[in-house]
Design a protein with these regions (language model features):
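FMN-binding flavodoxin-like domain, especially the glycine-rich phosphate-binding loop
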Residues: 1-2, 8-13, 17-33, 44-52, ...
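Feature detects long, helix-prone N-terminal segments enriched in hydrophobes
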Residues: 34-40
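Reductase modules of NAD(P)H-dependent flavoproteins
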Residues: 164, 187-198, 207-208
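Iron-sulfur cluster-binding cysteine motifs and their immediate structural context
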Residues: 195, 201, 205-226, 236-253
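Short Cys/His-rich zinc-binding micro-motifs
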Residues: 200, 231
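Positively charged, low-complexity nucleic-acid-binding target-recognition regions
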Residues: 252, 264-265
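Active-site-proximal loop/hinge segments that shape catalytic or ion-binding/gating pockets
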Residues: 258-263
Length: 265
């Protein structure tokens, strides 16, 4: 089984690709599990994979919450240790994301055997100095991801242990603990989102793209956010808008958009 969380499609593609390469038939979207606690029932010998996008040098808040409440059993046994691996997708650097994930799992007595990272196109546009990648960089990252996933799948089949991380960055603790905690506290919110009504064509694509169902249409067909604390700030709504009508304050006014396209991979 592979549990994954994805906003614009990068991580879903990675999870599904690795599942195919390792002949794993169960790929589950964590965002569809709206009522924690989650109980994972594995077959004997079945590994558990966890795939997620790095948000602010950390695992997304929803994933941390689900995993820290998860229970796990193998077959009819509750004390059999399964092989557990994690693959994160990242546009730039990972920081201590895997250390945080390991801590979340440890709360439920689950140990992480091996970790990997895959570099994918940037999607975060919520700060002035952050934007999507240029087309050449997008193409290069997608081209590099394929052999990287093949390597990861081989290691999973071998039941390898360790850390096969390439994009930790220079200031791991500062990024994940200091900046990352500030990121979660201040920037993981839907309150900065709004709609430029003059541009909106009422297509509803933003609502359909939200992985956690945090959006709806009002009586006039205009998108609105629920403000219920569920927003991941993954920017799926922003990136999927065909008219660039979704805005995050004023910081995204001149930013680009990106959604994973399997035809480019």
């Amino acid at each position: 089984m592979i549990l994954y969380l994805s906003g614009t499609g990068n991580t879903r593609w990675v999870a599904e690709s690795i599942a195919r390469m390792t002949e794993d038939e169960r790929v589950v979207d964590v965002a569809s599990l709206c009522s924690p606690p989650l109980h994972v029932q594995l077959n004997p010998g079945e590994p558990l994979g966890i795939s997620f996008p790095v948000h602010g040098w950390r695992p997304p808040m929803l994933l941390s919450r689900v995993l820290s409440e998860m229970t796990l059993s193998v077959g009819s046994e509750r004390n059999v240790k399964p092989y557990v691996y994690s693959v994160c997708t990242v546009g730039d650097t990972v920081g201590e994301s895997m250390d945080i994930l390991r801590s979340d799992l440890k709360k439920q007595g689950v140990s992480l055997d091996v970790v990997f990272d895959v570099r994918m196109p940037n999607t975060y546009v919520g700060l002035p100095f952050m934007d999507v990648d240029k087309e050449k960089v997008v193409s290069d990252k997608l081209h590099e991801a394929q052999p990287r996933m093949e390597f990861i799948a081989e290691k999973i089949r071998e039941r390898a242990n360790g850390a096969f991380m390439r994009y930790l960055g220079r200031w791991k603790r500062i990024n994940s603990r200091l900046l990352g905690e500030a990121f979660v506290r201040k920037l993981v919110t839907d309150r900065c989102f709004h709609v430029e009504e003059s541009l909106c064509v009422l297509c509803g694509k933003c609502v359909a793209s939200c992985p956690v169902g945090n959006m709806s249409l009002d009586d006039d067909g205009m998108p609105q956010w629920n403000h219920d604390g569920s927003c991941l700030t993954c920017f799926a709504c922003y990136h999927n808008c065909p008219r660039h009508a979704i805005r995050f304050g004023s910081v995204t006014d001149k930013k680009g958009q990106y959604v994973f396209d399997p035809k480019r991979a």
